């Protein structure tokens, strides 16, 4: 059963689920469609006091990860307009990480992260934090990341 975002938010409002935030990933769409759909999600969430995390650039899967993923990186020149037009509360950025287990250590573009940090003042999010390494995580936080997703490590720990 495919449930729409509107149905989820309607249920959350009606049944008082206590939802405080959501993550909307429309990064596989065109830039314009990502803006339009994210903006619509923010519009539905605001009256419910639900914060919205969006993604700009595309954080792929680790099995598809290669050293040449920069085509999907977040573009600093698009960030400010995206945040202003969507009203997103925080932004997941694509700077060299991927979801899932890595074969090796990812190559994070910290210069790109700094450029992104310089153009927006909302919290930035790093997806694909599992297996990134302590030094990379410390450096990411030092350079503007305020939330790190570590789902793979939690799933693995839960299975052990």
Feature map (PLM): residue ranges:
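Thr-Gly-centered strand-to-loop micro-motif
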Residues: 126-128
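Conserved His + Asp/Glu catalytic blocks
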Residues: 157
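Alpha/beta enzyme core
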Residues: 2-122, 134-145, 150
């Amino acid at each position: 059963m495919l449930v729409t975002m509107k149905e989820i938010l309607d249920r959350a409002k009606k049944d008082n689920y206590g939802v405080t935030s959501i993550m909307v990933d429309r990064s596989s769409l065109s830039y314009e469609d990502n803006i339009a759909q994210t903006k619509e999600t923010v519009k539905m969430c605001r009256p419910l006091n639900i914060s919205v995390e969006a993604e700009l650039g595309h954080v792929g899967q680790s099995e598809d990860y290669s050293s040449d993923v920069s085509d999907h990186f977040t573009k600093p020149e698009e960030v400010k307009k995206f945040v202003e037009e969507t009203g997103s509360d925080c932004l997941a950025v694509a700077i060299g990480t991927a979801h899932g287990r890595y074969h090796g250590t990812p190559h994070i573009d910290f210069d790109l992260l700094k450029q992104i940090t310089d153009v927006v003042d909302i919290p930035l999010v790093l997806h694909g934090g599992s297996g990134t390494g302590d030094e990379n995580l410390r450096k990411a936080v030092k350079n503007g990341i305020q939330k790190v997703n570590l789902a793979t490590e939690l799933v693995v720990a839960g299975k052990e």
